[in-house]
Amino acid sequence: MCVSRRRNSGRPILRVRAPHLLRARPHRRSKLKHRRISRKRATLAGSAVVALVAAGFTFQTANASDDVPAFGAKTLSADAAGKLATTLDRDLGADAAGSYYDATAKTLVVNVVDEAGAEQVRQAGGKARIVENSLAELKSARGTLTEKATIPGTSWAVDPVSNKVLVTADSTVDGAAWKKLSAVVEGLGGKAELNRTAGEFTPLIAGGDAIWGSGSRCSLGFNVVKGGEPYFLTAGHCTESVTSWSDTQGGSEIGANEGSSFPENDYGLVKYTSDTAHPSEVNLYDGSTQAITQAGDATVGQAVTRSGSTTQVHDGEVTALDATVNYGNGDIVNGLIQTTVCAEPGDSGGALFAGDTALGLTSGGSGDCSSGGTTFFQPVPEALAAYGAEIG
């Protein structure tokens, strides 16, 4: 992938920056498959001794086996691994149990529930890993959490490394809410794990230096093209509250909202209404830029970079996909990318990318860039599909 480091010229341009909103929290709007035999049953049938381990509320023991050799595992880039993961997830069907990129070995690790699936993975060039919980079972566990534990300040996502649903509670979850959440997670047994995070889950909304609207500030995510016309993507909780934008406080309009989706999703589309230059680049805050040529899906284990006007450029890793986060006030967002990239108020709506590939728009999270934290991103491909747009 190519990195463009073009020095800034004297011509005013509007690059990809991380949106932030300085105002109150936004208003709410709105092939046959082998039949597998459970490993648990096989263990009970083949042994007279069953070890029962009580782990309290946090289930630390993974139900996965790493003893399957990586026959023929291909050396892959993160991008190639992501494409292989998509193909295998489709081909494995009910035998699929998630996957992640091993950045050290440069291989795609694919979870499966039986040897037939493992052989299919090896033939495709992945490293097979037989685990206890299928992806369908983990999705069912997520459904239980949605039904019984929809509590502000919580999030959950399937973690393919531990083969569990990782449930996280922020500092606001205590008392009866904590007891309720703990009981639900405990009831899910080896399918879930409960953890705490410092701080509070919130959309990362605050002042920035990119675009202004109605006394509030945000900054764009990625420049895109729709029907041959220029637009940009930003966070939905920005476009939910502001209808038009300028590139200076009190300045002339440069764009007007064309669409907004928040909560449930967190993306918005703004159409340029001026002749402001709009290159498909991300500001690297060192006088250079990163060219963006395509959009893609993130992969667990992938190294990623975030650009934001508050904390500028920071790196991290994708830890989960299809995450759900409850920001409170009924603002629940689904299908997010969960990462270890730090972020702070003012970075909201900013660009998450890997090389020249656009991955996400900063939604929210907890912690900061001094102590670290968890940050969630709206996938870019979903937003592009919703609006019929493309990177450009």
UniProtKB/Swiss-Prot annotation:
What EC number(s) would the UniProt record show? 3.4.21.-
Which residues pair up as cystines?
Answer: C218-C238, C342-C369
Output the superkingdom of the source species: Bacteria
Entry keyword annotation includes Hydrolase = yes
Kindly state a single biological-process term from the GO annotations of this entry.
Answer: proteolysis
UniProt key word Disulfide bond: yes
Top-level EC class as recorded in UniProt: hydrolase
Q: What is the active site of this protein?
A: H237, D266, S348
Propeptide positions in the record are 65-204
Q: Which residues form the signal peptide?
A: 1-64
Which family does this protein fall into? Belongs to the peptidase S1 family.
Q: What is this protein called?
A: Streptogrisin-D
Please state the gene responsible for encoding this protein: sprD
